[in-house]
A protein has these predicted regions:
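Active-site acidic/histidine proton-transfer and metal-coordination neighborhood
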Residues: 53-152
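Alpha-helix-loop-beta-strand connector modules within alpha/beta enzyme cores
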Residues: 27-45, 102-116, 139-146, 214-226
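N-terminal pre-domain/capping segments
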Residues: 1-47, 51-73, 257
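Conserved, mostly hydrophobic/aromatic
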Residues: 2, 46, 64, 75, ...
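C-terminal helical cap(s) of enzyme catalytic domains, especially alpha/beta-barrels
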Residues: 243-257
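Non-cysteine beta-strand/loop elements that form the S-adenosyl-L-methionine
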Residues: 8-13, 43-45, 151-156, 185-197
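Gly/Pro-rich active-site loop or hairpin
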Residues: 96, 131-139, 160-231
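Active-site beta-loop-alpha junctions enriched in small/polar residues
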Residues: 15-17, 48-50, 88-90, 122-128, ...
Length: 257
């Protein structure tokens, strides 16, 4: 599928994304062998949707920790470049408590993460209770974790839903300047390049095909021309597939040309 669409970077789930079952080691070993033989490019693994590293529910939090631990072990087997996990949501709990839980889980997961895989935290879409959606909140989380091995993932739809003006070149410039001022630019490891179905600041995480949503081609053109993005891995998580996905990737490449 990656070859059919012209993809050079791939992100996958290595277990059922809607279950706590976690990855099977023998399956990871088989996939890893096939992936290395394919020699397509960087590989990233996304945490299952159920994982919430800031959950105030002790049982849910314990399950999230265990699933992260098993997932990063499997990432080492398949030699994935990064394991992506959302910053988490504390619901109605105090923000400081949710931040502490998220940081503690990230620290514990880092201790289990193999050298060939980097733990990456993805900012959320400004939803209620989210630990980190803004760059300032990301800085607070990175300070709490206090580990240089932790990397950052930015999702363009999430940022737009949070309120960043990514539909305007000057808004894109301002966001990346904030990233630099907060000393987060050198922690950026991956971009999830998704357009947004809803308007800026909606706090709604619904992805749209690049160029067909609220951010638009002008916004994405400004994003891909940022120096931090030019040599960065980019993953598309939109509703496109097959030939439509191939054309979408070509559009993104043309914006960067």
């Amino acid at each position: 599928l990656a070859r059919e669409t012209g993809a050079e970077v791939v992100q996958v789930f290595i277990s059922n994304p809607r279950a706590w079952s976690g990855p099977r080691l023998e399956t990871a070993q088989a996939f890893g062998a096939e992936w290395r033989e394919a020699a397509i490019g960087p590989l990233f693994v996304h945490a299952p949707y159920l994982v919430n590293i800031a959950s105030p529910n002790p049982e849910f939090l314990s399950k999230s920790i265990e699933l992260c631990r098993r997932s990063v072990a499997a990432c080492g087997v398949i030699e994935a470049g990064g394991f992506v996990v959302h910053s988490g949501s504390g619901g109605e709990a105090e923000v400081a408590d949710a931040l502490d839980r998220s940081a503690t889980v990230l620290q514990a997961t880092l201790a289990e993460t193999p050298d060939e895989t980097q733990l990456l935290v993805e900012l959320m879409a400004g939803t209620s209770g989210a630990v980190a959606s803004t760059l300032g909140e990301a800085r607070a989380l990175f300070d709490a974790v206090d580990d240089e091995r932790l990397g950052l993932v930015l999702d363009t739809c999430h940022l737009f839903a949070t309120g960043y003006a990514l539909d305007e070149p000057k808004g894109v410039d301002a966001m990346f300047e904030e990233l630099r001022q907060l000393d987060l630019a050198d922690r950026l490891r991956l971009i999830h390049m998704n357009d947004a179905k809803f308007e800026r600041g909606s706090k709604r995480d619904r992805h749209e095909i690049v160029g067909e949503g609220g951010i638009g081609l002008e916004g994405f053109g400004a994003i891909v021309r940022q120096p931090e993005v030019r040599d960065l891995s980019v993953v598309v998580e939109t509703p496109s597939s097959g030939e439509r996905r191939r054309l979408e990737l070509e559009t993104i490449r043309s914006l960067a040309a």
